[in-house]
Amino acid sequence: MSDIKFIEGGISIDYRGQISHVNDLNMEEIERFYIIHQHDTSIIRAWHAHQHEKKWFYVVKGSFTGAFVKIDNWENPSSGLKPEIFHLSAQESRILLVPEGYANGFKANEPDSVLLVFSNKILSVAIND
């Protein structure tokens, strides 16, 4: 069974507009965030692997497909590892939590998609992970 999980949120709409939320997100571990603006749907941003960094992914605009591989051996990973594929959309207000130990890659499904990424490591630590 996968260690990757969704944290479900919701979308509330009335005459004033729309609120997208993920009220069950516990932000105690989060040290930083960054935003990816993916204009081109032909570009794949991959493979970023982190032994110790945990990440939370939230689509602000558009949609993305993410592929994640649990690394079995950091010195000599197996070549036959199978990716887990997840689809994320701004139309579904939820966060994908990917624990440490995974390689990841993303592809925007729509032009000008925006992905918000939270991390449990500051940049100076994450760069060396």
Model-predicted segments: where are they?
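Non-catalytic, conserved peripheral segments adjacent to functional cores
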Residues: M1-Q91, P111-V114, F118-D129
